[in-house]
Curated annotation (Swiss-Prot):
Assembly description: Homotrimer.
Gene this protein is translated from: dcd
Domain of life where this protein originates: Bacteria
One GO term of the biological process aspect: dUTP biosynthetic process
Organism, as annotated: Corynebacterium diphtheriae (strain ATCC 700971 / NCTC 13129 / Biotype gravis)
Catalytic activity: dCTP + 2 H2O = dUMP + NH4(+) + diphosphate
Protein name as annotated: dCTP deaminase, dUMP-forming
Site residues (Important for bifunctional activity), renumbered to this chain: 116-117
Coiled-coil ranges from the UniProt annotation: none
Known function: Bifunctional enzyme that catalyzes both the deamination of dCTP to dUTP and the hydrolysis of dUTP to dUMP without releasing the toxic dUTP intermediate.
GO molecular function terms listed in the Swiss-Prot or TrEMBL record: dCTP deaminase (dUMP-forming) activity; dCTP deaminase activity; nucleotide binding
First-tier enzyme category under EC: hydrolase
Keyword vocabulary terms for this entry: Hydrolase, Nucleotide metabolism, Nucleotide-binding
Entry's EC annotation: 3.5.4.30
UniProt record similarity statement: Belongs to the dCTP deaminase family.
């Protein structure tokens, strides 16, 4: 079941769904808008000859914090990691799906590459996989609406929600754009 605006408000008021900072104006008919944080991870193209998911490549990306009042410029063909301004905490019976904003998609901004699903039990800031498929640079302003999170009630709560000890949830509690930890899947 997809949550409506009413369902989202009820879940927040009941303390089931955590959103910090919360702004009621972000609630849409069947989703909640998410805003861009000021932290980005850019790829260091000169440090590695290639990306190997099996290897821990700590210097593959560098953290960039955009100064107050300034944008981040995403160039054509560029891929960076961003983060939501909001921290989300989902209970064991609610899953989420992050989607881009139509108005930004029409400008060539992709909000995520493949990782739009948010598991029940997740708590943290959502990492955005930002790509510019336009032929002009796009300015990304901290605080701007960049996506929307649709919420789904599961038929029953997850027995082992994200963050459970049995799962080895690599991104639980993440703050800011978190680089890939794919190498942990090979251990």
């Amino acid at each position: 079941m997809l949550y409506s605006d009413k369902d989202i408000r009820v879940a927040i008021d009941a303390g089931e769904l955590g959103i910090e900072p919360f702004d009621a104006d972000l609630i849409q008919p069947s989703s909640i808008d998410v805003r861009m944080d000021r932290l980005f991870r850019v790829f260091n193209n000169s440090k590695y000859t290639h990306i190997d998911p099996k290897q821990q490549q700590d210097e593959l990306t560098s953290l960039v914090e955009v100064p107050e009042g300034e944008p981040f410029v995403l160039h054509p063909g560029e891929f960076v990691l961003g983060s939501t301004l909001e921290k989300f905490t989902l209970p064991a019976h609610i899953a989420g799906r992050l989607e881009g904003k139509s108005s930004l998609g029409r400008l060539g901004l992709l909000t995520h590459s493949t990782a739009g699903f948010i598991d029940p039990g997740f708590s943290g800031y959502i990492t955005l996989e930002l790509s510019n498929v336009a032929n002009l640079p796009i300015t990304l302003w901290p605080g701007m609406k960049v996506g929307q999170l649709a919420l789904f009630k599961m038929t029953s709560p997850a027995q082992a929600p994200y963050g459970s000890n049995v799962l080895g949830s690599k991104y639980q509690g993440q703050r800011g754009p978190t680089p890939s930890k794919a190498y942990l899947n090979f251990r």
